[in-house]
Amino acid sequence: MRNVDFKQIASRYEKELRENCLPFWLEHSQDNVFGGYFSCLDRDGSVYDTDKFVWLQGREVWMFAMLYNKVEKNPEWLACAVQGAEFLKKYGHDDNWDFYFSLNREGRPLVQPYNIFSNTFACMAFAQLAKATGSDEYAQIARKIFSRILERRSNPKGQWCKAYPGTRPMKDFALPMIICNMALEIEDILEDKDILEQTIDTCLHEILDVFYQPELGCMLENVSSLDGKPLDCFEGREINPGHDLEALWFMMNLGVRRGDKALIEKLVDISLRVIERGWDKEYGGIFYFLDVKGAPQQKLEWDQKLWWVHIESAIAMLKGYQLTGNEKCLDWFLKLDDYLWTHFKDKEYPEWFGYLNRRGEVLLTLKGGKWKGCFHVPRGLYQLWQLAADCGRGE
């Protein structure tokens, strides 16, 4: 057993969350005029665009509600979550409880509700806030959204799907991954527990029996929606190591919930195969996208190093170690921990950078934008704090 000071690691992540990350979002992201949150924040927290992206609205509600429920009953956190939820409730969705992709500052829709992930993060937000407030209204909203997600699951984009029907129908890995996590989030408020278990079973089957390719040691981002088979095209060859590792720690939680040690061991084994494939052996860090055959990429950002990829991977590795004691997981966590704090942490301003080039140099100094908001950094800091603290108790 190596001498790793888990208590010091836990303290470092807790301090970063409480003193650096959360104050940044509380101070700079809240729109005190129209409600909701600004996510387009520059390095120093100044707002550079006022459009509101519904994924990130829901994620920030969830974040502060979750911390209120699990860390401390901080009234500032709860007030932040409630005002964001009220904005979403009033402006975020159409009459069918489909959530728009983006709104202008005042809450008028900008982009149609084509993206089902707007629904999934709204569902998580209202479910977590229902726990924090005891509000039956928020619980009912979460249940309505969950039902709508299940209705849309087989054709998530619906009328806004741009693919020509029938030629090459595909389904993507991200949806079962997110639903897998969402199921645990809303367990306490669901009235029909059978639907919950069926949803979890379906997601586990989809991820492990359809998207996961044992001979490749990774999940494919897209497979045929007709028979679940791999497709030899740009989308079909695409792998995203960060997505894989995020899904794997979600499923480790399901393994814990079900007391399934064999499942946990399998997930840890897969996670090690994924990270070994995804790691950039020349410059360090994890590639954003890879082609399963090593063919040229269609996505120009394939070799960038992104904040969420490394944070989610660190969670997967530390959780794998905590659950199984596998030293390879610990080795990878320590390597990722060093990479995160060396490359993504801003030494001059709060919050972390999101986008690096392949060499690990900062590409964009923003702290928030269309895709980066109050989610992966604070959730990751919280998760790694808790996991390290748990490992420290076992020393």
What is the predicted role of each segment?
Residues 1-395:
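Glycan-recognition and catalytic cores of secretory/periplasmic carbohydrate-active enzymes
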